[in-house]
A protein has these predicted regions:
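Ferredoxin-reductase
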Residues: 2-83
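Short, Lys/Arg- and Gly-enriched loop/turn segments at beta-strand edges
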Residues: 45-54, 94-101, 244
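FNR/FR-type flavoprotein reductase catalytic core
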Residues: 73-216
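Short gly/pro/ser/thr-enriched loop/turn and capping motifs at secondary-structure boundaries
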Residues: 140-142, 164-165, 221-225, 250
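Local cysteine-cluster metal-coordination motifs and their immediate loop/turn environment
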Residues: 197, 219-248
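Short microdomains enriched in Cys/His and/or Lys/Arg
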Residues: 245-258
């Protein structure tokens, strides 16, 4: 784990309420794996000793990118940071996704849950592993970075609650349609998911019932990042796990959903 002072290279709005933060972070960029996260200290907050956790959207060439949604005081304060300024960033933290896959990698995300999935898709593309993305949002504006997945050659299956783009409904609607075809063809596949709990439970249930690997990135508020505060608990078959050190990526068969 590293603690770097990172220059802000770019900080731009990429949609209503969504921003992309690009940092010069050579140490973290060379060490981080898809699914791991970083802790960012937000100077504008009085309690800035407590850092905010963010998934890594991409990393390489000495840079780390973070895609985030403005949802509270922490991210609202982070919005004020400008290119040319610097931030204290700690990472990489947590356990990420496996970077191997037997068959087709089915990436399932909701909203900004696509953030770690893009990093993973890029790694899979470099290894010649086929990925397919199933992504959901309330409206088309909540479907992020589809052009970047397209550039990797990833076939995308968008879904929106209001039917404004792609299939009407949740991401599991096009996922289930694709699963039928894969099973009929006898194709191997694995699940990789990140997003709201309802989506993660749905993907976990499918992985367990089909007896195939499922890797689930659980979204919790990881305050300390090192397992000390027990604020990011997730129930598992072995008891309570701390998402910041035991996850955030878990095997679907180990998760217990209430």
């Amino acid at each position: 784990m590293l603690d770097e002072r990172c220059l802000i290279v770019e900080h731009a709005e990429i949609g209503s309420g969504y921003r992309l933060l690009v940092l010069d972070a050579p140490g973290i960029a060379s060490a981080v794996k898809p699914g791991q996260f970083v802790h960012v200290r937000v100077p504008a907050l009085e309690e800035s000793a407590l850092r905010r956790p963010f998934s890594v959207f991409d990393a390489g060439e000495d840079r780390v990118s973070i895609l985030y949604k403005t949802v509270g005081r922490g991210t609202a304060a982070l919005n004020l940071a400008k290119a040319g300024e610097s931030l204290r960033v700690e990472g990489p933290l947590g356990k990420g996704f496996p970077e191997s896959c037997s068959g087709v990698a089915l990436l399932v995300g909701g909203g900004y849950g696509v953030a770690p999935l893009y990093f993973l898709a890029r790694r899979f593309a470099a290894r010649g592993i086929e990925s397919r993305l199933f992504v959901g949002g309330r409206t088309k504006a909540d479907l992020l970075a589809l052009d970047k997945f397209d550039a990797l050659g990833v076939k995308t299956f968008p879904a929106t609650n209001d039917g404004s783009f792609g299939t009407k409904g949740f991401a599991v609607v096009p996922l289930d349609e694709e699963l039928r075809g894969l099973r009929e063809a006898g194709s191997a596949f694995e699940f990789f998911a990140c997003g709201p709990d309802g989506l993660l439970k749905a993907v976990s249930d499918r992985a367990v019932s089909l007896g195939v690997p499922g890797w689930i990135s659980v979204d919790r508020h990881m305050i300390c990042g090192v397992g000390a505060c027990y604020a990011c608990i997730q129930k598992t078959v072995s008891g309570n796990a701390r998402c910041c050190v035991d996850g955030p990526v878990f095997n679907a068969r180990d998760l217990v959903w209430s």
